[in-house]
UniProtKB/Swiss-Prot annotation:
Component of the heptameric ring U7 snRNP complex. Gene3D superfamilies: 2.30.30.100. Residues 124-199 form the Sm domain. The gene is lsm11. Signal peptide: none annotated. Residues 155-289 are annotated as: SM. Component of the U7 snRNP complex that is involved in the histone 3'-end pre-mRNA processing. Increases U7 snRNA levels but not histone 3'-end pre-mRNA processing activity, when overexpressed. Binds specifically to the Sm-binding site of U7 snRNA. InterPro entries: Lsm11, Lsm11_M, LSM_dom_sf, Sm, Sm_dom_euk/arc. GO terms for biological process: mRNA 3'-end processing by stem-loop binding and cleavage; regulation of chromatin organization. This is U7 snRNA-associated Sm-like protein LSm11. It comes from Xenopus laevis (African clawed frog).
């Protein structure tokens, strides 16, 4: 075999030659390599892994001994970029056409809120509210409670939505407190005519409306009589007491006096001025332009 290697010409060991003898090249220790500085792999699996991983496989093989510290742990270093792989990726990229029109950026949507949706209600009852907002027309809003009418708010509207929720400024409110207790079943239901008729009756002695006090005179109910102001005529008004039997004192038994409770006027009307107010749509009963 050694004699054949000595007699074999150099073309039999040349990989690029047509007369290359692979069996002779495997057993020959002097087989010339086309690239003398080529990297050697241990087996084909390592070579295939290098082809699939590119720079990663090369970096793993080159830095296998350097990637571990003295404690045996791997260091989280990124591998160096492979220029050959970068060139291959650049060749796969499609060329950019010079005369191509650039893509326009997406337009930002206009904000949608209560103020932008108010003009969209033109031609409807809500469109009239928008006209009152633009022309600053004073309106009146009738507000209800769980039983019926509560009061009237007169002012300028600044915002509203499709549910009839509205914000108003410079508001003058005329209202009556809700009826509670047994009076709920006995008092007549409040109407707009009764509300303003009651207000006219209370006008002569009006109080400060800003504090929510009643617009009419104070109640003319008398205060409950005190112990010191009790007259002897009131004491004698009770039923006659028979004299007690012998052996008992003849003093009369004390009578219990009941304090009279102040009568609450549920028909009392109040007025107040508000700088701004928010009215929920479920409480709106009627809206009309103030004359």
């Amino acid at each position: 075999m050694a004699e054949e290697e000595d007699e074999a010409p150099g073309s039999c060991l040349d990989v690029s030659s047509e007369s290359f003898n692979p069996l002779l090249a495997l057993y020959s220790p002097q087989t010339p390599l086309p690239f003398p500085d080529i990297r050697c792999f241990n087996n084909l699996a390592e070579y295939e892994s290098f082809l699939r991983g590119g720079a990663r496989g090369r970096a793993r093989g080159a830095q296998r001994g350097q990637s571990r510290g003295p404690g045996g742990k791997r260091k989280g270093r990124k591998p160096e970029p492979d220029p050959e792989r970068i060139e291959r990726l650049k060749q796969l990229m499609l060329p950019v056409e010079e005369g191509k029109v650039p893509v326009r950026p997406r337009r930002s949507r206009a904000p949608k809120n209560v103020l932008t949706r108010m003009p969209l209600h033109a031609g409807s009852p809500l469109g009239e509210l928008n006209r009152c907002v633009q022309d600053r027309i004073r309106i009146r809003v009738h507000i209800r409670t769980f039983k019926g009418l509560r009061g009237v708010c007169s002012g300028f509207i600044v915002a509203f939505d499709k549910f009839w929720n509205m914000a108003m400024v410079d508001v003058d409110e005329t209202y009556r407190k809700p009826v509670l207790g047994k009076a709920f079943y006995n008092e007549p239901q409040l109407t707009l005519t009764r509300l303003f008729d009651r207000l006219q009756l209370q006008e002569p002695g009006s109080h400060d409306p800003a504090k929510g006090r009643p617009a009419g005179p104070a109640e003319t109910l008398t205060a409950p009589p005190s112990k010191k102001s009790t007259q002897p005529s009131e004491r004698a008004a009770g039923p006659p007491v028979e004299p007690g039997p012998q052996g008992h004192s003849g003093n009369r038994p004390k009578q219990r006096r009941r304090n009279r409770k102040e009568k609450v006027d549920y028909q009392q009307v109040f007025t107040r001025h508000l700088k701004q107010i928010f009215i929920r749509g479920e409480n709106v009963l009627l809206v009309h332009i103030a004359e």
